């Protein structure tokens, strides 16, 4: 079982094989997903919401990301580990972007993911020149939520769609190995996918992308605060956990647990 690399992903796109990607934030989930042979595990700054309880990804720090990257990396043998670069970790200077990207690689990530294009393309290029693989992220970029005023659909208008395609080409030119495309119309995503050679991984971007990514807590039914239209719940693990905990509480209160089989 060979570990997934950037070459693996390029070959999948060329062969028309879909790429699978999920978020992971700890050793236990990473080990489970890795055993299922998920291609990419994203240590997303979404941990700010689903793990740390923030309202957005903006408060997440480099220290938060390093901590969770280390845990996920310990649980993977097959999956590529990609780490989000958090808010303000790459926005100031190319030098700081390289230093922070390096911290995440040393923590165990194979690559980093950076949101945006024009405002940060010099930073993306610097990180790639430092021999660190970069995954791009276009469309809805959650770290810019305060600028855009919400999590609305992007690239609805023709002008914005054309800009999205241009941005994808720019990112490809500077050397990103893949691009996440978030919350854009399916036909726009199809145009982007056909315009570049690098894999396009969609989240709320329709079926024409080269792969798909979801937040694991969303697709497992564990995060009830927010459920976007693009999320499919493959299980209701939250309900299973609640039922199990309620049963445990009941058995402890009634003196049924621990029984003889659980005692020494």
From Swiss-Prot:
Pathway: Cofactor biosynthesis; (R)-pantothenate biosynthesis; (R)-pantoate from 3-methyl-2-oxobutanoate: step 1/2
Entry's family note: Belongs to the PanB family.
Record keywords, A-Z: Cytoplasm, Magnesium, Metal-binding, Pantothenate biosynthesis, Transferase
One GO term of the biological process aspect: pantothenate biosynthetic process
E.C. no: 2.1.2.11
GO terms, molecular function: 3-methyl-2-oxobutanoate hydroxymethyltransferase activity; magnesium ion binding
Cofactor or coenzyme needed: Mg(2+)
Gene: panB
Function: Catalyzes the reversible reaction in which hydroxymethyl group from 5,10-methylenetetrahydrofolate is transferred onto alpha-ketoisovalerate to form ketopantoate.
Subunit structure: Homodecamer; pentamer of dimers.
Positions contributing to 3-methyl-2-oxobutanoate binding: 45-46, 84, 113
PANTHER family found in the cross-reference section: 3-METHYL-2-OXOBUTANOATE HYDROXYMETHYLTRANSFERASE
Listed Pfam families: Pantoate_transf
Species of provenance: Caldicellulosiruptor saccharolyticus (strain ATCC 43494 / DSM 8903 / Tp8T 6331)
Residue positions of the active site: 182
Gene3D superfamilies noted in UniProt: Phosphoenolpyruvate-binding domains
Location(s), subcellular: Cytoplasm
Name the UniProt record assigns to this protein: 3-methyl-2-oxobutanoate hydroxymethyltransferase
Residues the entry annotates as binding Mg(2+): 45, 84, 115
Reactions the enzyme catalyzes: 3-methyl-2-oxobutanoate + (6R)-5,10-methylene-5,6,7,8-tetrahydrofolate + H2O = 2-dehydropantoate + (6S)-5,6,7,8-tetrahydrofolate
GO cellular component: cytoplasm
């Amino acid at each position: 079982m060979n570990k997934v690399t950037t070459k693996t992903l390029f070959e999948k796109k060329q062969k028309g094989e879909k790429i699978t990607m999920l978020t992971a934030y700890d050793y236990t989930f990473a080990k489970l997903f890795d055993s299922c042979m998920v291609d990419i595990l994203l240590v997303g700054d979404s941990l700010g919401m689903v793990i740390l309880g923030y309202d957005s990804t903006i408060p997440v720090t480099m220290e938060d990301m390093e901590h969770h990257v280390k845990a996920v990396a310990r649980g993977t043998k097959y999956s590529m580990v990609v780490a989000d670069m958090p808010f303000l970790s790459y926005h100031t200077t190319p030098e700081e972007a390289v230093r922070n990207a390096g911290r995440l690689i040393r923590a165990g990530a194979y690559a980093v993911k950076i949101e945006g294009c024009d405002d940060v393309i010099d930073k993306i290029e610097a990180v790639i020149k430092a021999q660190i693989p970069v995954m791009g992220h276009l469309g809805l970029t959650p770290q810019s939520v305060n600028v855009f005023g919400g999590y609305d659909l992007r690239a609805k208008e023709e002008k914005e769609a054309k800009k999205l395609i241009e941005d994808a080409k720019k990112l490809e030119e500077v050397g990103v190995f893949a691009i996440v495309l978030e919350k854009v119309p399916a036909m726009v995503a199809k145009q982007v996918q056909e315009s570049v050679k690098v894999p396009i991984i969609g989240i709320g971007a329709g079926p024409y992308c080269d792969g798909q990514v979801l937040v694991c807590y969303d697709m497992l039914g564990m995060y009830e605060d927010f459920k976007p239209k693009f999320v499919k719940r493959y299980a209701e693990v939250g309900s299973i956990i609640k039922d199990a905990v309620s049963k445990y509480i009941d058995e402890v209160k009634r003196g049924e647990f621990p029984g003889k089989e659980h005692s020494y």
